[in-house]
Amino acid sequence: MSDVTLLRIGIAIVGILFVAAVFFFSTPKTSAHRVRTKKEEPPRERREPMLSTEADNSPPQGVDEVPASVSQQQVNPEANKPGEVQLGKRPTNHFDKIILLFVAAKAEHTLRGEDIVVAAEKTGMIFGYMNVFHRLVEGYPEHGPIFSMASILKPGSFDMANIREMQIPAISFFLTLPAPMTALDAWEKMLPTVQRMAELLDGVVLDESRNALGRQRIAHIRDELRAYDRQQQVPPLIKNSRW
């Protein structure tokens, strides 16, 4: 028998022994590990996405604490039934910028649910998707909201069945870009609405940092939105096919 044949037989025997050893030692250990994992693994707590962060009796803590009002929204089953018109729903979940304002109650006061609903109707907002209020493009509701308004308390929605008992420290207004119109035009729709809501509710307008919204901040936001609109109008760079 040649040396090559003996070498092949030796390799085959070693391979068989190795496979048998792996199977013998790994099978019981794997089974025990699976049983142990199954017994020790604690039940997972089901977590729902949220529309806004929980707030205390102080004014809101800024844009990072109010979930882009869009990215952590709590879905209300009644607001998402198949086949129903969902007024205020964005055509797409994509967004790249959010402008946030608040109307907060004055010290030692709260905003009453009934008053909020009346003020929202007076300023042209409608109750819709996610059980919050929206300003829509007149005649084109399918284009989605220009901006929306929610409670700063979880889950952010307005429970109309118990609206008379509702008392909250503030409401949030959020403009999510891209909007169904230019960013600057959308801002010019939102700002007077927020100011009017504050007037009707005897509240104060705050920016995303909990500061009173002043002229300087308003001018800065307008500049930001002009720059955003210019950026959106820049055509993409496409290489010439000849090159």
From Swiss-Prot:
One of its GO terms (cellular component) is plasma membrane. Pfam families: ZipA_C. It is a single-pass type I membrane protein. GO terms for biological process: division septum assembly; FtsZ-dependent cytokinesis. Residues 38-49 have a biased composition (Basic and acidic residues). It comes from the Bacteria. Its main location: membrane. The chain crosses the membrane at residues 5-25. Residues 1-4 are periplasmic. It is found in: Cell inner membrane. Residues 26-243 are cytoplasmic. InterPro entries: Cell_div_ZipA, ZipA_FtsZ-bd_C, ZipA_FtsZ-bd_C_sf. Belongs to the ZipA family. PANTHER family: CELL DIVISION PROTEIN ZIPA. Interacts with FtsZ via their C-terminal domains. Essential cell division protein that stabilizes the FtsZ protofilaments by cross-linking them and that serves as a cytoplasmic membrane anchor for the Z ring. Also required for the recruitment to the septal ring of downstream cell division proteins. This is Cell division protein ZipA. It comes from Xylella fastidiosa (strain 9a5c). The gene is zipA.
